[in-house]
Amino acid sequence: MKVVAFERQQQGTGASRRLRNAGKTTGIVYGGEAAPQKIELDHNALWHALKKEAFHSSILDLEVAGQSQQVLLRDVQYHPFKQLVLHVDFQRVDAKKKLHTKAPLHFLNAEVSPAVKLSSAIVSHVATEIEIECLPADLPEFLEVDLSKIEAGQSLHAKDIALPKGVALVAHVDAENPVIASATVPAGAVSDAAEGETPAA
């Protein structure tokens, strides 16, 4: 995905306000051996790009002053109550170095699972993304989570995800294998089932 930006000459709070009034958003590119680079982007184009999941999870081709570099979106600052992007951070990517980032989770086939079909359970998505490590060339746009075999009362964990080649989960001390989805039967459904099984007097 290509992103066009321009070198930012003006700095400071007043300059940022003037840029916003002109329909621009400030940003910075950092990482690698090059010095951090201050940039500005067209606000409307950026606003629409940020609505796309791939913009947050893919390697982006950022063009500044005719020079292209591969980057990852690392941070976005929004206005507290206006539909306004205040600032964005991009990190340069080295094709030979592994990167840590978060991949979105796409949940599939819950409607055909035993939990839903046999037990009328509700499948909850406990996590919407997960931290991974891989080379830039191996970075997946998203990870699929197959829920077709989940049963009532069961949970799926991070290590249940089928990872593409070259992609590894980043383990954390406090949650090495976190729950990403669970299937629970609503209390009302359990009560109704119990009443249906009560033998007649």
Swiss-Prot record:
One of its GO terms (biological process) is translation. The keyword Ribonucleoprotein applies. Pfam families: Ribosomal_L25p, Ribosomal_TL5_C. This is one of the proteins that binds to the 5S RNA in the ribosome where it forms part of the central protuberance. Part of the 50S ribosomal subunit; part of the 5S rRNA/L5/L18/L25 subcomplex. Contacts the 5S rRNA. Binds to the 5S rRNA independently of L5 and L18. GO terms for molecular function: 5S rRNA binding; structural constituent of ribosome. GO terms for cellular component: cytosolic large ribosomal subunit. This is Large ribosomal subunit protein bL25. InterPro entries: Rbsml_bL25/Gln-tRNA_synth_N (IPR020056), Ribosomal_bL25/Gln-tRNA_synth (IPR011035), Ribosomal_bL25_b-dom (IPR020057), Ribosomal_bL25_C (IPR037121), Ribosomal_bL25_long (IPR001021), Ribosomal_L25_dom (IPR029751), Ribosomal_uL5_bac-type (IPR020930). The keyword Cell wall biogenesis/degradation does not apply. Belongs to the bacterial ribosomal protein bL25 family. CTC subfamily. It comes from Burkholderia cenocepacia (strain HI2424). HAMAP family: Ribosomal_bL25_CTC (MF_01334). Gene3D superfamilies: Ribosomal protein L25, beta domain, Ribosomal Protein L25, Chain P. Keywords: Ribonucleoprotein, Ribosomal protein, RNA-binding, rRNA-binding. Signal peptide: none annotated.
